[in-house]
């Protein structure tokens, strides 16, 4: 069993910028869970189930708001089966994931981001649930996987004009939920060992079918995005190690987002001394200075285009020395870790 209790009180005084806010959230979660696993020759089976009761009480200026105080009673299952024999393996799984919004999003207060950008939460956000089906297969150094997700009440940021009559040109970033979203993906990985060269090739395809018509955004595009990366490791004579990695992400249009082609190349040369306690590393990041991030965002009567260079280009020398450090003997995470992350 698991119990989590949260009591959060936020007071925002805006000094005339916008209306003040006084939000108080009390939440309690009670859960019980069980799982069963069994091995049958080359097969492994696992089943789990979790029952969760969640009660939220939301107060604005001391008054309980019923519409913002939901109660959930959820059954969350997990099913998995895998087979492995003679270097070959195959797996199938299904799981339901439940995600609650961060508490910082459950507020009506307007926050200042910049002269032309404000942000606002949404106390009416519902719990996001993801039904995920996945399959994977491997043989020696080859691996393939595929997944399909059906996401209910997916959280997303949207943009819209903020009080055009008194704040012309200002965009408001708000959080909304899209009732139903489908997410598909496949991945291929190859990691052979060819003498001193150990390459690792990854090819991924992601497809997001996100229709935002119900929240007022008419743009709806369906185009997959491909991601290709190649990581090369070279174990050279006399203890030298060289690594060169690069990636390429193709342009795509998904839902109301448009992304551009991105790519980057990095390199690293290192050698250890004094029984591997002293390491000297030469680094070169974003060698071709291509670390740009491009995206366009369509909103409600609004459009935003971004082209950002993330200043990744670096050339340097690193020297590190390892001392005898005592490792932590405790590796637990605690039952309330996800709730603390929301805070």
Feature locations, PLM:
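C-terminal beta-barrel architecture of Gram-negative outer-membrane proteins
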Residues: 205-210, 225-273, 283-288, 296-297, ...
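C-terminal beta-signal and adjacent terminal beta-strands/loops
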Residues: 273-343
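Outer-membrane beta-barrel signature, preferentially recognizing the C-terminal barrel domain
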Residues: 24-25, 67-70, 98-152, 171-184, ...
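Surface-exposed extracellular loop regions of Gram-negative outer-membrane beta-barrel proteins
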Residues: 27-65, 72-78, 198-207, 228-251
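Outer membrane beta-barrel strand-and-loop segments of large Gram-negative receptors
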Residues: 20, 26-29, 120, 126, ...
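Transmembrane beta-strands of outer-membrane beta-barrel pores
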Residues: 1, 38-42, 51-57, 83-87, ...
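Residues on the lipid-exposed face of transmembrane beta-strands in outer-membrane beta-barrel proteins
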Residues: 32-38, 79-83, 92, 125, ...
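Transmembrane beta-strands of outer-membrane beta-barrel proteins
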Residues: 1, 45-49, 77, 90-92, ...
């Amino acid at each position: 069993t698991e119990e989590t209790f949260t009591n959060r009180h936020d007071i925002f005084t805006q000094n005339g910028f916008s209306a003040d806010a006084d939000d108080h959230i009390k939440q309690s979660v009670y859960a019980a869970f069980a799982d069963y696993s069994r091995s049958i020759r080359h097969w492994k089976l696992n089943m789990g189930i979790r029952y969760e009761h969640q009660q939220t009480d939301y107060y604005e200026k001391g008054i309980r708001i019923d519409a913002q105080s939901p109660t959930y009673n959820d059954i969350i299952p997990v099913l998995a089966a895998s087979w492995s024999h003679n270097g070959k393996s195959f797996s199938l799984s299904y799981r339901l994931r439940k995600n609650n919004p961060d508490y910082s999003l459950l507020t009506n207060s307007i926050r200042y981001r910049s002269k032309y950008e404000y942000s606002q939460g949404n106390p009416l956000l519902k719990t996001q649930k993801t039904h995920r089906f996945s399959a994977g297969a491997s043989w020696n150094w080859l691996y393939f996987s595929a997944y399909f997700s059906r996401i209910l009440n997916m959280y997303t940021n949207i943009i819209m004009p903020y009080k055009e009559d008194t704040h012309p040109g200002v965009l408001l970033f708000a959080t909304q939920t899209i009732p139903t979203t489908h997410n598909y993906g496949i991945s291929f990985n190859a990691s052979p060992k060819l003498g001193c060269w150990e390459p690792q090739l990854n090819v991924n395809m992601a497809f997001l079918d996100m229709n935002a018509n119900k929240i007022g955004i008419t743009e709806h595009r369906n185009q997959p995005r491909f991601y290709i990366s190649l990581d090369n490791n070279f174990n050279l004579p006399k203890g030298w190690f060289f690594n060169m990695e690069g990636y390429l992400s193709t342009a795509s249009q998904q839902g109301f987002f448009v992304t551009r082609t991105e790519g980057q190349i990095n390199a690293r040369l290192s050698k250890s001394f004094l029984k591997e306690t002293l390491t000297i590393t030469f680094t070169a990041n974003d060698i071709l200075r291509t670390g740009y991030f491009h995206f366009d965002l369509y909103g409600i009567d609004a459009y935003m285009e971004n082209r950002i260079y993330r200043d990744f280009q670096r050339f340097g020398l690193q020297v590190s020395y390892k001392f005898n450090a005592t490792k932590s003997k405790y590796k637990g995470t605690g039952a309330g870790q996800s709730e603390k992350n929301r805070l």
